Design a protein with these regions (language model features):
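Alpha-helical transmembrane segments in multi-pass membrane proteins
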Residues: 33-41, 69-170
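Alpha-helical transmembrane segments
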Residues: 5-22, 40-45, 68-83, 126-134, ...
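Canonical alpha-helical transmembrane segments
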Residues: 44-66, 84-85, 107-115, 241
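Juxtamembrane "helix-exit" motif on the non-cytosolic side of transmembrane helices
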Residues: 20-30, 53-56, 81-92, 135-147, ...
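N-terminal topogenic module of multi-pass integral membrane proteins
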Residues: 1-61, 324
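Membrane-interface helix-boundary motifs at transmembrane edges
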Residues: 55-69, 112-124, 147, 178-186, ...
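Juxtamembrane helix-loop-helix connectors linking adjacent transmembrane helices
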Residues: 99-101, 120-124, 140-237, 289-292
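Transmembrane helix-loop-helix hairpins at the membrane interface
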Residues: 198-342
Length: 342
């Protein structure tokens, strides 16, 4: 029997929350109030994120909060309060943290509110919003804390996911983003086909020739592999596919609709590849600039660009970020589990 759409979102949220909670409780040296509050906040942020993939929820949010600017800022104010409260819980509240959190949440919302009158294409306002969401985390401009504090995930990643989905779906009303989380047959089909093509013809040949991948000798227990895949899907695949396929590729394709779709796919894949320029996986080529030496992970950039091409194909074929996010999790999971000694 097919799971009803809303039931799927509830079951998925609850399942992620239970799994994440059990893992953290089993690994904790002691169960503190801070840990329990952190887990509750994690569950809340996962639930709101997953709920916004339900078209009925999106429609209700648009009717409730999408009619005037003050109403539109109410959910973001909720995220801001959660952020401040969590920083207080960790004794990590600073004036700069408050200011950067405020700017991170409200500037994209204001820009996208005034961008609603324009066509759903790449404009300077939504480009600025995308860069703020991306670079504030990439450059550690927002507080670098985890949830839970010990052994958790980046707190602002969950804040970013909620805010970017809310800003573009509810405020900007970008209905072409393709934010859907319930998989169908096409999602699995394209994910598996492109996974096989990428690994067989690109990842393994290029990876071994360049020394980027090595057969691991320290195997993790097999039961951990599905958990690794789920973690990568939620905290790497989903955010990166939202950003690079659902927003950057999508808006560029709309902006340059008279340009070959393959060129847009190529261009967005190159952007995706160079977004990994700060990764620390050898081999490197060293660039000397302003008296400093910068290691450039050239093999990583090449393979990421090629992978980005296949992620983009999955996005184009399905019209959803889900297929590329699944494919992304499969690719990274394959690398992490089987070929990454680190």
């Amino acid at each position: 029997m097919k799971i009803q759409l809303r039931n799927f979102h509830i079951l998925f949220s609850v399942g992620v929350f239970i799994l994440f909670t059990l893992m953290n409780l089993l690994q904790a040296d002691q169960i503190s109030v801070s840990l329990l509050v952190s887990l509750v906040l994690f569950g809340l942020l996962i639930f709101t994120l997953v709920s916004m993939s339900d078209p009925k929820v999106v429609d209700a949010l648009q009717r409730r909060f999408g009619n005037n600017l003050l109403s539109a800022l109410i959910p973001l104010t909720g995220l801001f309060i959660i952020t401040i409260g969590y920083l207080i819980l960790l004794n990590g509240l600073t004036p700069s943290g408050v200011m950067m959190s405020f700017l991170y949440l409200y500037i994209p919302a204001l820009l996208l509110w005034y961008d609603r009158q324009n066509d759903q294409i790449m404009t300077w306002m939504n480009l600025t919003s995308i860069l703020i969401v991306w670079l504030f985390i990439e450059l550690d401009l927002v507080p670098n804390v985890s949830i839970p504090q010990e052994g958790g995930i980046l707190f602002f990643l969950l804040i970013a996911l909620n805010s970017i989905v809310y800003n573009f779906l509810i405020i900007r009303r970008l209905d072409t983003m393709g934010y859907r989380l319930q998989p169908n047959k096409d999602d699995w089909k394209h994910s598996c086909i492109y996974l096989g093509l990428f690994i067989a013809f690109f990842a393994i040949p290029i990876g071994f020739i360049t020394g980027f991948i090595h057969q691991t000798t320290n195997w993790s227990p097999l039961w951990q592999f599905p958990i690794i895949l789920l973690g990568i899907f939620l905290f790497t695949g989903l955010p990166e596919e939202l950003l690079f396929r659902g927003l950057i590729h999508n808006l560029l394709a709309a902006r340059f609709n008279n340009t070959s779709p393959l060129f847009i796919l190529f261009f967005s894949s190159i952007i995706f590849g160079f977004a990994h320029i700060n990764n620390n996986d050898p081999p490197f080529v060293y660039v000397h600039l302003f008296g400093n030496e910068f290691p450039i992970p050239w093999a990583y950039i090449i393979l990421s660009s090629i992978a980005g091409w296949f992620y983009g194909l999955a996005y184009i074929r399905t019209g959803s970020i889900l297929a590329p996010a699944i494919l992304h999790a499969m690719v990274d999971g394959w690398w992490v589990y089987f070929f990454n000694p680190n």
